[in-house]
């Protein structure tokens, strides 16, 4: 059994943010409820893919209220359309994880910094397809968080005009 980025986001959304271990536990629970097996390597790859596609984003510590052990938490990202998979409806009760408050503005600033870094690398390498994809992400980021990404878009536009 595997999950797409929107299903992973659908498992994270009710909690505000989850650690990778908590998300893995949630996915195992959903797989169990569906009578399916879960491949840990495939799940890790799906989570990595969701992060790469901005469906999930890593929360900087200042963006989430969490008395944890410093473990990175994942939150729903700007390109996600959270869709809990069948069998996920009871996860909040099963996992016993309280909802975490995520500061969207702080999280948005961290996402913008990541986007800027990826933009610089894509432009420097002349990766026009990557630039186009990141341009689309930039619009999603502004709709998702109270941040301004116009400077990044200007760089994308300039690179695509060359």
Where is each model-derived feature located?
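Glycine-rich, aromatic-bearing surface loops/beta-hairpins
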Residues: 106, 110-162
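Charged low-complexity interaction tracts in eukaryotic proteins
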Residues: 3, 18-21, 31-33, 37-102
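The alpha-helix within a helix-turn-helix
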Residues: 24
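Short secondary-structure junctions and interdomain/linker hinges
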Residues: 15-18, 54-58, 122, 141-145
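Residues that form generic nucleotide/phosphate-binding pockets
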Residues: 11, 46, 50, 155, ...
């Amino acid at each position: 059994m595997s999950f797409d980025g929107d299903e992973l986001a659908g498992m994270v959304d009710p909690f505000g943010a989850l650690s990778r271990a908590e998300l893995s536990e949630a996915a195992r629970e959903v797989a169990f409820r569906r009578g399916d097996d879960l491949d840990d390597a495939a799940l890790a790859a799906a989570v990595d893919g969701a992060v790469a596609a901005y469906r999930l984003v890593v929360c900087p510590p200042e963006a989430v209220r969490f008395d944890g052990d410093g473990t990175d938490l994942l939150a729903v990202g700007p390109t996600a359309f959270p869709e809990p998979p069948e069998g996920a409806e009871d996860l909040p009760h099963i996992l016993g994880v309280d909802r975490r408050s995520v500061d969207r503005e702080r999280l948005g600033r961290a996402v913008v910094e990541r986007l800027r870094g990826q933009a610089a690398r894509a432009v420097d390498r002349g990766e026009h397809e990557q630039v186009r994809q990141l341009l689309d992400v930039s619009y999603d980021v502004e709709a998702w968080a109270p941040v301004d990404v116009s400077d990044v878009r200007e760089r994308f536009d300039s690179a695509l005009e060359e």
